Regions:
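An amphipathic alpha-helix adjacent to DNA-recognition modules
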Residues: 1-8, 12, 17-21, 26-29, ...
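Short amphipathic alpha-helical interface segments enriched in basic and hydrophobic/aromatic residues
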Residues: 8-12, 58, 84, 115, ...
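Generic structural signal for secondary-structure transition and capping sites
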Residues: 16, 88-89, 119
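Short, hydrophobic secondary-structure boundary micro-motifs
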Residues: 19-20, 91-93, 156
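Secondary-structure edge/capping motif, primarily at the C-terminal ends of alpha-helices
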Residues: 60-64, 90-93, 121, 147, ...
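Helical hydrophobic small-molecule/effector-binding pocket
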Residues: 69-115
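Amphipathic alpha-helical packing segments from all-alpha helical-bundle domains
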Residues: 97-123, 127-134, 138-141
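C-terminal peripheral helix-coil segments that are non-catalytic and often amphipathic
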Residues: 137-138, 146-157
């Protein structure tokens, strides 16, 4: 956990490519051998942080029935509440210092969820649904980034 927190701290200040294992271990006050006993490299550590958040996001999405408008609105509210509980990690992983892999993973999860749940309900053409999903997902992620960067100045409701 301390290595994950230390990497997130460093990502607030500098680009991922500029961070070294030595620097991370000094901040975390652990030996490099301890780091390498758990991770292949810094990108492996970053991927584990991202995957943990993505797994939680998938759990949130799977609890809602997107076909019912009321539940779709509740789902959006719950997602924003989830982001609020993981604000620091999400803000850091979606900033310009991190690589784009986390945003891409979030986009993929959201796209799959929309295609699985929305296309069938609305009986839309797959090709049209792909474009519509890309539009919705991109806009939603930009809105979430803006909301987080503005200190979550609006209520999830």
């Amino acid at each position: 956990m301390i290595l994950k927190d230390s990497l997130l701290t460093l990502l607030k200040e500098k680009q991922m490519a500029a961070i070294t294992v030595k620097e991370l271990c000094e901040l975390a006050d652990v030996n490099r051998s301890t780091f390498y006993a758990h991770y292949l490299d810094l990108y492996d550590l970053l991927a584990q942080i991202e995957d943990e958040l993505i797994e939680e996001l998938n759990m949130y999405l799977s609890t809602y029935n997107f076909t019912k408008e009321k539940e779709a609105l509740q789902m959006t509210e719950k997602l924003l509440e989830y982001l609020a509980t993981r604000q620091d990690e999400c803000k850091t992983l979606l900033n310009e210092n991190s690589d784009s892999s986390f945003q891409k993973k979030v986009e993929d999860v959201a796209h799959q969820f929309i295609m699985k749940n929305w296309m069938a309900v609305n009986r839309l053409d797959q090709n049209f649904s792909e474009y519509l999903s890309a539009f919705i997902v991109s806009g939603s992620i930009q809105m979430m980034k803006m909301w987080i960067n503005n200190g979550m100045d609006k209520s999830p409701k």
